[in-house]
């Protein structure tokens, strides 16, 4: 009877559900293992074949660890707030809750069809008020710690859509949806002070077992720079402009200053004759995103303000320009330009014919900026000094004259945390009539998102919540003071910053989770997901975790001990899968045609888990053929026997298989572990008798990858219990190597025969066996043996003529 996945897979899925097979055990005597997937956004499109790749990896580990005697926490949930559901609501007039619930149902069905061993009792959904009560509670704690504040921030405002857009939603000054013009305008926003944690976020990376590339991306994003601040007075004004530079030693090479167009001094210092040009330039910049403005490849633009600054060290007058490549949100929003030794400044100086003064020897600065090291020149007291000596000398000079100071800065910006959207967590803040602000008490949470008959932009820059008039009104239960609720909502990042904590104790109504449970399960042992979350999600989650650590909620400094990024599955033509290319593969179709176990096996066998690999129908068919061979092997019921003596070669292959699969699966090298399972099947097919205990061990090794087939074969072998908790097989070190080996016999340097000889055979015994071999005798014939060379454990060469 051929292997029928359409019968076998639903049978075992129903059995697992009925038995609640994967409920998390919490035996205090056992060690815990927390295997976490990056939970998905439940989109309308459902799962694609990229999702199961990471999910199968964590499932293999979870299933293996259960058999190895661990308590395993392997949960799944939904990161369900976000733009697509809101856009759907705007486009159709339907409630995003319905859309989200339908999508979750589809995703959940698909995940169950793939046989993942999730503990569905712990399912969470970021849009559930019982969940976001705690997201809001964490926000109140951030506020109490002074880490959440309101600020005027320049945002991407799209008048046509009546809403604020994230940088990713703006392309070439137009909205991604509808191609409407977008302008930069200042707006009141909630900001989280992640910069307070910059040093710790940087230092603690060293303690994590993460891909080096991800750690490096986070280091660059945090961007720690050591240098100095220098104060330049403005000619004819009482104001001074402070700039930050990592090269204060080049201060004598500064030939102009550049302010960001949004710098608060621009209006005051611009002279009358330059006013019109400055205003026009500022207007032109408003349609550009920060990314476009800082693009190194683009042509430099800028305009002179008519004002001059005074170099505090040399006394030189320097023209003050504004240019879009300087951002108000970075550093001090102003730079001292040293065109001889900075590429962007050099391009700008060439563009606008500004002076270029060499202060570090080593290049031809008229042609190109010299950014290397060298002796200082044209720099008064710094002449002849090296870079480090010059930096120390000039900082001392700046501090003595009180015109500058040593300074460490970070590229990391504070985190803009509010969105002018409906479909997000309401921010638990009230603006009171007396002008104060208060966060809601824990007893007033969750602050639920109100049902609105029609979700549409308010048009004022506020979220659609500004239209929910009854909901907006608030009366303080203690003082009776009236207030108006905050209308901004949280970004999608809010709910995903801490979800791994809620999985630990998802039904707790008094706290995020029981402190003892947090202590038991944290940090997460393995976190698998795509590299696209390398910076934002992982940095934000680390930040929140550290705040929770500081206030005594969590017991560890870091949330995720080991992180692993799976690669991307590309289309057959090596292109990224996308709807527009028409090369997206739906896992439902594969489950129907080949089976879930085939899909799981194929995706793990495609190549190393972290590599990007092209989809191949041939490869998929090959995976199915292997499972068919396994099925046929177990159809040899008469050959499956309880035996006391076994074939030595087969025994060796079995023990090698247990060892290699255990090690490879533990090290997330699933493709090579699966190769070894194939070696075992090849060897088994040569055997007239199949020892039952070898086949039993093989099923257990195969099951984490192909659980439905594994359970079916386990039942066929006569076991009544599920193998979810069957003890993982062990190997015997002494059985890994053979006590005999194949020895090559050469006559006059050519291979003429082979013999199986004991590993312990002496040189004399090997010679005797070789000369007794019939084939060897034929080749020697009546020749005279001149010499015999024995290479231990390899070959014997007989020289005869």
Curated annotation (Swiss-Prot):
Q: What is its EC number?
A: 6.1.1.4
Matches recorded under SUPFAM superfamilies: Anticodon-binding domain of a subclass of class I aminoacyl-tRNA synthetases, Nucleotidylyl transferase, ValRS/IleRS/LeuRS editing domain
Q: What does it catalyze?
A: tRNA(Leu) + L-leucine + ATP = L-leucyl-tRNA(Leu) + AMP + diphosphate
Signal sequence interval, chain numbering = none
Enumerate the residues binding ATP: 579
Q: Which GO terms describe its molecular function?
A: aminoacyl-tRNA deacylase activity; ATP binding; leucine-tRNA ligase activity
**Where is the protein found, in the record's own terms?**
Cytoplasm
Q: Which Pfam families match?
A: Anticodon_1 (PF08264), tRNA-synt_1 (PF00133), tRNA-synt_1_2 (PF13603), tRNA-synt_1g (PF09334)
Organism's domain of life?
Bacteria
Sequence similarity: Belongs to the class-I aminoacyl-tRNA synthetase family.
Please name the HAMAP family in this protein's record. Answer: Leu_tRNA_synth_B
What name goes with this protein? Leucine--tRNA ligase
What gene codes for this chain? leuS
